[in-house]
């Protein structure tokens, strides 16, 4: 019986070990562990409501119920998360329960939270655990929440740890791991132990240990392995290694060897020196070092030199290695979470702590310099600071969160021609300092900074290739011209606007590692806004999983964007210093501004040097550029590098995002990649919605975006004509047409600026509860109104004017600032010059207060409104040929101001519209106005009906002349035009062809009748019949 008892006890002991789940059933290789699939999301975006304007996250009320139903409905979708707890332990449940006393760290909990049956401890979960497994009853967790990636426990998002058997915050878990980071660290340490205890003891050489037999052998093997790796890195692979030498170590072995080297203690004399350096450095820092002893135990100089050489050779020998490590570090199509945490258990943290006290030698480069990769690493001292495991972020003196005096002098202004020249901190740069390191009241932007703009001269309107290229000298000569000047009215063109003065919309991406939306501070928006020195005119954001990826769309001036990217490291230091909370100082995050990439960890900021070498996608256009709210449509996305592996395309709108399924376009010869998005529809919008969304394309941590306007059908029809600006058919345009269109290389940037500004206004119209400063400045309204008039966007102009009136209406009238702005841009003059009858009719009849009585209605655009030189729309139309419709519209205004002012309204030179028309021989204009005045006096209505006979010969000549003008477009068109011209010229006779055909038909009938009448027909009687013998009479 004793033997039987012994045989029974052994399986019970094994089952108890399996229940702890602290050891694997069998040894698993690193390759198998790394190839396990990992879940992408740590939190569900549908469970959080994100305010894109306030930067605030609120949990959804029914998030737990919906999440539970989703998990319960899954059938075998994530079988890799099954715990298989308690299987095979039915016979020994009592034994397992009694053995819990042996494990004091395992807390035995009561089965019920206050009821008659045990329930799950997750909030709002009423799962009955009476018939559940013993494991679930003891730990008060149901099977669904034990496998869930997150659950709401105590009003906090947590996750159940399978090794601790309790709930922890999401920040204590790595991506896809079912156990907390603390348990995994101990588990990884046990797995890295070798099978022989003496080899474990020889991993660290302790002074005074004279038993150096195994230590010397292991040290020699490690040294040989490092030399072999260095030889392979220097291209000496052809040399056959000697017999008995170790093979080339892999990455894990190199990390273990470096970890052993870093564990070596420093000599006593060097320790004393480091003590002095560390004390001096701590005096310059605002917050003391938590553990000064860790900073003193740095690596020896020889170790640092070895690490620098190894890091440099590995980086230079494999150019593609950085890209692979970078894409793996910032996410790809399989995972969006940064894998930097995989190095935390190795040598990375120790290396960063030990390199604090060393100073580099030589100059530092600016973070915005456009240099080659070889020029970026021209300093040996900078390479010495490199770390093997964090090769992507090169440590340098400018990487510190707070620049010191010694390092701040190495930042050069944009005006310096010598990159090695030392400049003192007090030297003032040429460019205006938009981002000062210390915030001061002088750097605050005034509220009316964008409301006031200087009066411009009389410049020709060339925005978006307008047809004003024939305007005269912008410095108009106006006020003293002679009456005989032939084209006095055309010399007073409306002032031009430049899109370069408008803000540029860009994106700043923050990847907050080990965070979830519940940990974001309530002052997040104000902190980012203050970090940018209160410069942005607009800010909008959204979040998505992958820790927390915060994408912030910012509208700033181009100069502000340039300075932010040039001094990104300094600006991040200001963010860490001036933040009112400890959120940024205690967080690990990565910042991407589009051209620069930087990271923060343990109080240090680093810039990526290999960021420019990545193959990033680029969006050229999205067609159509505007979609109707609530309707389904198809999109065509064009750009570069859109078909590479790892590309993801999404649509972001109002704080949420939606992944889009794309298909490759039909193969054809194009210079861009084309992707089709079928069945695209913006969710949760009503039919009259006005807004904007972004189409984003991303590869890893770098991407591009394009604005997409959401509006009604009439506005979308007008805006979709902008698609031609992104892909002009230059091969079908002649030189004269290209000059007349005036579409240079800046056309795409101007159109993007117009779409972005229009999108910001539409977004503000939907989120009117958040009014910032002046809401939307008059200068930005000016830019949108001018662009819309120059494009003949009548529906858009009416919408913009309504929004302008809504924001500037005082006592049923526009305020003085808005009236001055409208008088400055002269919308009616622009429409008259473009001969846009629909736009002129819209502006003439536009009412500020349409709901009031007719006697108190206010019209803004009057025909007699004066511009530069006293020129009015009547003067401008009178001196323009072919403007009969313009004269008719301007003299048919509701208040009849144009009709009564035709003969009396004078400009600065004393000329009236009547004299303008007479000088340009447009006498029909004067006749038209005179007839209308006569009808008004006689209270009658007269109609002018003209009968015009089109000369076929003249029409043929005009057609041939037009074909000759356009015959130089291409060879095929010239051939067709030549044939058409010959055919027309050959058919020119005395009589036109239709008349000849009619004459021939009549002649044919006459001949037939004559022949029939004069013939001698045969009669039945046989006698001849003669027409001459016939007589007439009654029958």
Curated annotation (Swiss-Prot):
Originating organism: Arabidopsis thaliana
Keyword Zinc: yes
Record note on cofactor: Binds 2 Zn(2+) ions per subunit.
Disruption phenotype: Plants display elongated petioles and enhanced leaf margin serration and are able to germinate and develop in the presence of the programmed cell death (PCD)-inducing fungal toxin fumonisin B1 (FB1).
Sequence positions that bind Zn(2+) 2: 161, 164, 168, 180
Domain notes: The SBP-type zinc finger is required for the binding to DNA.
GO biological process: positive regulation of DNA-templated transcription; regulation of DNA-templated transcription
Cofactor: Zn(2+)
Keyword terms, alphabetized: ANK repeat, Cytoplasm, DNA-binding, Metal-binding, Nucleus, Repeat, Transcription, Transcription regulation, Zinc, Zinc-finger
Pfam families reported for this sequence: SBP
Tissue spec. comment: Expressed in vasculature of aerial parts. Expressed in cotyledons and leaf petioles.
Listed name of the protein: Squamosa promoter-binding-like protein 14
């Amino acid at each position: 019986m004793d033997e039987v008892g012994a045989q029974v006890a052994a399986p019970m002991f094994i089952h108890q070990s399996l229940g702890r789940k602290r050891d694997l059933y069998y040894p698993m290789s690193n390759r198998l562990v790394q190839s396990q699939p990992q879940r992408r999301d740590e939190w569900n975006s549908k469970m959080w409501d994100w305010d894109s304007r306030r930067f605030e996250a609120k949990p959804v009320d029914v998030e737990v119920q919906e999440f539970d139903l989703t998990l319960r409905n899954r059938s075998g979708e994530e079988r890799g998360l099954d715990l298989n707890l308690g299987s095979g332990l039915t016979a020994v449940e009592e034994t397992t329960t009694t053995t819990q006393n042996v494990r004091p760290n395992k807390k035995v909990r009561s089965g019920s939270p206050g009821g008659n049956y045990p329930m799950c401890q997750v909030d709002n979960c009423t799962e009955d655990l009476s018939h559940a497994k013993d494991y679930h009853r003891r730990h008060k967790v149901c099977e669904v929440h034990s496998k869930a990636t997150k659950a709401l426990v105590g009003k906090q998002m947590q996750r159940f740890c399978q090794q601790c058997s309790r709930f922890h915050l999401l920040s204590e878990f790595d991506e896809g791991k079912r156990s907390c980071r603390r348990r995994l660290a101990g588990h990884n340490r046990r797995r890295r132990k070798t099978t022989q205890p003496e080899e474990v003891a020889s991993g660290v050489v302790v002074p005074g240990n004279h038993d150096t037999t195994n230590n010397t052998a292991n040290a020699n093997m490690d040294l040989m392995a490092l030399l072999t790796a260095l030889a392979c890195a220097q291209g000496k692979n052809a040399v056959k290694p000697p017999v008995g030498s170790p093979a080339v170590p892999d990455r894990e072995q190199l990390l273990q060897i470096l970890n052993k080297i870093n564990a070596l203690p420093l000599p006593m004399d060097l320790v004393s020196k480091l003590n002095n350096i560390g004390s001096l450095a701590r005096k310059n820092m605002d917050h003391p070092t938590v553990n000064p002893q860790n900073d003193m135990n740095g690596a020896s100089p020889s170790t640092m030199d070895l690490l620098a050489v190894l890091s440099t050779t590995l980086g230079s020998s494999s150019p593609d290695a950085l890209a692979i490590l970078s894409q793996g570090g910032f996410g790809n199509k399989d995972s969006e979470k940064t894998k930097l945490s995989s190095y935390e258990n190795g040598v990375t943290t120790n290396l960063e702590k030990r390199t604090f006290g060393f100073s580099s030698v030589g100059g530092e480069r600016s973070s915005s310099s456009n240099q080659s990769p070889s020029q970026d690493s021209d300093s040996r001292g900078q390479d010495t600071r490199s770390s093997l495991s964090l090769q992507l972020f090169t440590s340098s003196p400018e990487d510190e969160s707070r620049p010191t005096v010694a390092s701040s002098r190495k930042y050069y202004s944009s005006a310096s021609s010598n990159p090695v020249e030392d400049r003192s901190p007090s030297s003032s740069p040429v460019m205006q300092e938009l981002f000062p390191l210390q915030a001061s009241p002088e750097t605050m932007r005034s509220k009316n900074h964008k409301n006031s703009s200087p009066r411009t001269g009389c410049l020709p309107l060339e925005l978006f290739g307008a047809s004003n290229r024939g305007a005269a000298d912008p410095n108009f000569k106006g006020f003293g011209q002679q009456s005989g000047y032939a084209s006095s009215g055309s010399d007073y063109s409306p002032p031009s606007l430049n899109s370069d003065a408008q803000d540029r919309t860009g994106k700043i991406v923050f990847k907050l590692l080990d965070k979830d939306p519940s940990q974001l501070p309530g002052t997040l928006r104000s902190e980012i806004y203050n970090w940018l020195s209160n410069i942005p005119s607009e800010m909008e954001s959204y979040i998505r999983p992958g820790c927390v990826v915060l994408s912030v769309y910012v509208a700033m001036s181009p100069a502000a964007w340039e300075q932010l990217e040039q001094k990104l490291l300094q600006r991040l230091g200001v963010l860490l210093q001036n933040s009112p909370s400890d959120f940024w100082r205690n967080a690990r995050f990565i910042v991407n501004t589009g051209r620069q990439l930087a990271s923060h960890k343990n109080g240090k900021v680093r810039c990526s040097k290999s960021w420019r070498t990545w193959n990033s996608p680029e969006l050229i256009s999205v067609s159509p550029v505007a979609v109707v709210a609530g309707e389904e449509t198809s999109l065509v996305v064009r750009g570069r590098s859109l078909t590479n592996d790892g590309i993801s395309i999404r649509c972001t709108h109002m704080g949420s995002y939606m992944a889009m399924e794309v298909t490759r376009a039909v193969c054809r010869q194009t210079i861009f990649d084309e992707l089709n998005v079928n069945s695209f529809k913006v969710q949760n919008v009503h039919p009259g919605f006005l807004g904007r969304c972004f189409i984003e394309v991303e590869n890893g941590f770098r991407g591009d975006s394009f604005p997409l306007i959401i509006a009604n059908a009439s506005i979308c029809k007008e805006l979709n004509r902008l698609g031609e600006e992104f892909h002009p058919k230059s091969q079908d345009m002649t030189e004269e047409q290209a000059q007349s269109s005036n579409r240079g290389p800046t056309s795409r940037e101007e159109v993007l600026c117009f779409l972005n500004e229009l999108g910001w206004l539409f977004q503000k119209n939907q989120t009117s509860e958040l009014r910032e400063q002046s809401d939307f400045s008059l200068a930005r309204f000016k830019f949108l109104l001018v662009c819309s008039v120059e494009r003949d966007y009548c529906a858009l102009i009416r919408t913009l004017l309504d929004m302008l009136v809504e924001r500037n209406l005082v006592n049923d009238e526009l305020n003085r600032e808005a009236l001055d702005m409208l008088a400055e841009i002269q919308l009616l003059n622009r429409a008259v010059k473009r001969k846009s009858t629909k736009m002129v009719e819209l502006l003439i009849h536009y009412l500020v207060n349409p709901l009031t009585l007719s006697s108190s209605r206010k019209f803004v655009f009057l025909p007699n409104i004066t511009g530069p030189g006293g020129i009015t729309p009547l003067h401008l139309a009178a001196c323009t040929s072919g403007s009969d419709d313009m004269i008719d519209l301007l003299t048919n205004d509701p208040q009849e101001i144009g009709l009564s002012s035709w003969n009396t309204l004078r400009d600065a030179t004393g000329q009236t519209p009547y004299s303008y028309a007479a000088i340009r021989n447009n006498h029909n204009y004067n006749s038209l106005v005179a007839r209308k005045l006569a009808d008004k006096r006689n209270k009658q209505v007269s109609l002018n009906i003209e009968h015009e006979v089109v000369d076929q010969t003249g029409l043929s000549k005009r057609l041939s002349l037009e074909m000759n003008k356009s015959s130089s477009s291409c060879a095929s068109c010239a051939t067709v035009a030549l044939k058409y011209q010959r055919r027309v010229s050959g058919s020119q006779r005395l009589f036109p062809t239709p008349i000849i055909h009619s004459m021939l038909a009549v002649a044919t009938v006459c001949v037939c009748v004559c022949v029939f009448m004069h013939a001698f027909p045969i009669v039945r009687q046989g006698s001849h019949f003669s027409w001459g013998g016939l007589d007439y009479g009654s029958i």
